[in-house]
Amino acid sequence: GKVIREISSREEQIAAGETKQVLCEFEVNHPHLWNLNDPFLYTVKTEISGQDNVESRIGIRSIRFNENSLFELNGKVVKLTGHNRHQNFPYLGGAMCDRYQREDADILKYQLGCNFMRTSHYPQAKSFLDRCDEIGLLVFEELPGWQFIGDESWKQLCYQNITDMIYRDYNHPSIIMWGVRINESLDDDDFYTKTNALAHELDPTRPTTGVRYLRESSFLEDVYGFNDYHLAPKGELRRPNYHPYFVSEYLGVMFPTKSYDNIGRQVEFARRHASSLNAFYRSSDMAGATGWSAFDYNTHIPFGHGDRVCYHGLTDIFRIPKLAAYVNQSQADAKESKPMVFIAKYLVPAYFEDHEELDQGYRGRTYVFSNCEEVELFFEGESMGRLKPDDEAFPYLPHPPFVFEVPYTFQGMRETTHMEAVGYIDGKEAARFERKISVRARAVKLEADYSTIEANGYDLTRVVVSVVDEHGQYLPFCQLPVTFTLEGPGELIGENPLGMEGGRAAVYVRSTMETGVVKLTGKCRDLDSCEIQINFVKPNGTFVS
């Protein structure tokens, strides 16, 4: 790229084993600012006497919380909306390759409509943060910990953790706050006065924050973070009692929802997300809100489910979206992302499923999530109306749900039953979504995210596994097992056989050091099987074997 500035420092003498900081200051005239929609990055090359060099990417931007307690990026107010991310993947935990660390950032921004996220509850992979820089996703990064505060030697490790975090990640323009309080811990004013001062000493350019579940707590940081679950059953949020203030967690813990729960619960989970977002946008002095959580995750205690999985996410642990994910996706501006429309309903001829909906008030009611101006819903080819969004129930939401009354029951379904939603912007069709009735399982479907990966021993691709009907739709309540065979120089990571969860699940295919073609086959009883191929190619860069 074009060199815009070049400077040299004074000569420094550094003894063997010594560490020294050398400050070089320079100005960039008329800089290209880093922002959400144009995350421009500069590269700074630092060289030591022609012997060694390192390249760092930076973004030039200004951040602050203004007198109205709102966040400003480059002088413009940004309402911080996002979710928490546990760096946890099925079968691999946190030890996932860079490809999928980066992809999580893409999911947060482009599939879940986030402009902001929290690294709960620890610093996360550099490759993830690099991707946040590249796509314009704001980050709150915090020191490791959860609830427990130890003795003085333990606290010394916390000081070191803060130091390491800030030194490692200082150059990331996406990071806008440092978390200097152990998540959900009790007050310890002496300890947290020191952590706050340390962060300010190491980085005076960024505000500090801390996350607590205490409504009345010592406010020692620059921004008050609060885990707000008190009004979750109503989908509400409390009013700020300190300023600046943001909600660091909401909803998920209080209404865990599996991808294979009944439709009534799944829709209610989505509706509560819409209601919580509506409450956030209603507040004129709440800087941000991050829901709990983006993805389901493994846990070390049961949390009531007995399988060591927390079902608090907008997606399942495989990053397969639940219905609620589309509430968040629909909040993105159609001009900045793309128009979308989604029917939050399955057409399943199941007696008990229909009656569970009746118990929870959803029989005949169909929610449609869209960022279009109008939506028309068709059932069996007949229009159920062309509606505006429900801004009476969700008056502050950028794009409220559309609610249709559709008079159907399972007894009236036929093999040709279908439902279609059409979204309109400026009176013209902008998006379309269709559901057909699911009657019986017909085939196994395998979909690899990537058909080509590097043969370096750690690169991999996710393979989404589905049991589908005659229309190619996954069966939302199917639990059948799929058995795999793998041919070629690869490794299958996951369960074999693998039971479906809501008709879908996933495995991973990891490369070895050998190039070639891998064939993965999925079989389930007498259903049509499926085979895919994945190419392992020579690595593009250097690696450590």
Regions found by a protein language model. Give the residues of each.
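Substrate-binding/catalytic cleft of secreted carbohydrate-active enzymes
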Residues: 104-331, 336-356, 364, 390
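Secreted/periplasmic carbohydrate-active enzymes, especially glycoside hydrolases
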Residues: 1-123, 131, 135-139, 161, ...
